[in-house]
Protein backbone atom coordinates (compact mmCIF):
# COMPACT_ATOMS: atom_id res chain seq x y z
CA UNK A 1 0.00 0.00 0.00
CA UNK A 2 2.21 2.82 -1.23
CA UNK A 3 0.98 6.32 -1.63
CA UNK A 4 0.70 7.58 -5.15
CA UNK A 5 2.57 10.77 -5.97
CA UNK A 6 0.62 13.97 -6.54
CA UNK A 7 2.41 14.42 -9.86
CA UNK A 8 0.79 12.81 -12.89
CA UNK A 9 2.56 11.68 -16.02
CA UNK A 10 -0.73 12.20 -17.83
CA UNK A 11 -3.21 15.08 -17.67
CA UNK A 12 -5.80 14.64 -14.93
CA UNK A 13 -7.06 18.21 -14.62
CA UNK A 14 -6.60 21.57 -16.27
CA UNK A 15 -3.78 22.46 -13.90
CA UNK A 16 -1.86 19.23 -14.35
CA UNK A 17 0.65 19.33 -17.18
CA UNK A 18 2.23 16.12 -18.26
CA UNK A 19 5.72 15.81 -19.55
CA UNK A 20 4.31 15.03 -23.00
CA UNK A 21 2.07 18.12 -22.99
CA UNK A 22 4.91 20.43 -22.04
CA UNK A 23 7.17 18.84 -24.68
CA UNK A 24 4.45 19.29 -27.33
CA UNK A 25 4.15 22.96 -26.41
CA UNK A 26 7.90 23.43 -26.81
CA UNK A 27 7.75 21.72 -30.22
CA UNK A 28 4.83 23.94 -31.21
CA UNK A 29 6.82 27.01 -30.18
CA UNK A 30 9.68 25.87 -32.40
CA UNK A 31 7.24 25.35 -35.27
CA UNK A 32 6.06 28.94 -34.74
CA UNK A 33 9.66 30.11 -35.34
CA UNK A 34 10.35 30.83 -31.67
CA UNK A 35 13.97 29.86 -32.29
CA UNK A 36 14.19 32.93 -34.54
CA UNK A 37 11.95 35.40 -32.69
CA UNK A 38 12.09 34.29 -29.02
CA UNK A 39 15.20 32.12 -28.60
CA UNK A 40 15.78 32.99 -24.94
CA UNK A 41 12.23 32.18 -23.89
CA UNK A 42 12.23 28.97 -25.92
CA UNK A 43 15.54 27.92 -24.33
CA UNK A 44 14.11 28.63 -20.88
CA UNK A 45 11.14 26.37 -21.66
CA UNK A 46 13.39 23.60 -22.93
CA UNK A 47 15.72 23.88 -19.93
CA UNK A 48 12.80 23.69 -17.51
CA UNK A 49 11.52 20.66 -19.39
CA UNK A 50 14.90 18.94 -19.07
CA UNK A 51 15.09 19.85 -15.37
CA UNK A 52 11.59 18.46 -14.85
CA UNK A 53 12.62 15.17 -16.48
CA UNK A 54 15.48 14.90 -13.99
CA UNK A 55 13.15 15.64 -11.09
CA UNK A 56 10.73 12.98 -12.29
CA UNK A 57 13.58 10.48 -12.39
CA UNK A 58 14.36 11.41 -8.78
CA UNK A 59 10.64 11.16 -7.91
CA UNK A 60 10.44 14.82 -6.88
CA UNK A 61 7.01 15.15 -8.41
CA UNK A 62 5.71 18.43 -6.94
CA UNK A 63 8.82 20.30 -8.08
CA UNK A 64 8.65 18.61 -11.47
CA UNK A 65 4.99 19.60 -11.83
CA UNK A 66 5.81 23.26 -11.16
CA UNK A 67 8.63 23.20 -13.72
CA UNK A 68 6.40 21.54 -16.31
CA UNK A 69 3.77 24.22 -15.81
CA UNK A 70 6.41 26.95 -16.12
CA UNK A 71 7.88 25.31 -19.22
CA UNK A 72 4.44 25.12 -20.80
CA UNK A 73 3.76 28.80 -20.10
CA UNK A 74 7.18 29.83 -21.43
CA UNK A 75 6.64 27.79 -24.59
CA UNK A 76 3.15 29.19 -25.15
CA UNK A 77 4.41 32.73 -24.67
CA UNK A 78 7.33 32.16 -27.05
CA UNK A 79 4.93 30.77 -29.67
CA UNK A 80 2.46 33.65 -29.23
CA UNK A 81 5.17 36.28 -29.48
CA UNK A 82 6.62 34.59 -32.55
CA UNK A 83 3.23 34.43 -34.23
CA UNK A 84 2.69 38.10 -33.42
CA UNK A 85 6.04 39.01 -34.94
CA UNK A 86 5.30 37.01 -38.09
CA UNK A 87 1.91 38.74 -38.36
CA UNK A 88 3.58 42.16 -37.98
CA UNK A 89 6.00 41.27 -40.76
CA UNK A 90 3.14 40.16 -42.99
CA UNK A 91 1.26 43.40 -42.35
CA UNK A 92 4.39 45.42 -43.12
CA UNK A 93 4.80 43.52 -46.40
CA UNK A 94 1.17 44.15 -47.35
CA UNK A 95 1.55 47.84 -46.52
CA UNK A 96 4.66 48.04 -48.74
CA UNK A 97 2.74 46.39 -51.58
CA UNK A 98 -0.15 48.82 -51.18
CA UNK A 99 2.24 51.75 -51.17
CA UNK A 100 3.92 50.47 -54.34
CA UNK A 101 0.56 50.08 -56.05
CA UNK A 102 -0.48 53.58 -55.01
CA UNK A 103 2.79 54.97 -56.37
CA UNK A 104 2.22 53.18 -59.69
CA UNK A 105 -1.31 54.53 -59.93
CA UNK A 106 -0.10 58.05 -59.24
CA UNK A 107 2.59 57.70 -61.93
CA UNK A 108 0.04 56.37 -64.41
CA UNK A 109 -2.22 59.37 -63.75
CA UNK A 110 0.54 61.83 -64.59
Question: What do these predicted ranges mean?
Answer:
Residues 1-2:
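Sec-dependent N-terminal signal peptides
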Residues 5-110:
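Long, charged/polar, soluble alpha-helical segments
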Amino acid sequence: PGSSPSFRLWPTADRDFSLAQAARMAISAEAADARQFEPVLLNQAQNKLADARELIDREQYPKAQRLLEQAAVDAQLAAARSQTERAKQAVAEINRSIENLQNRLEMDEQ
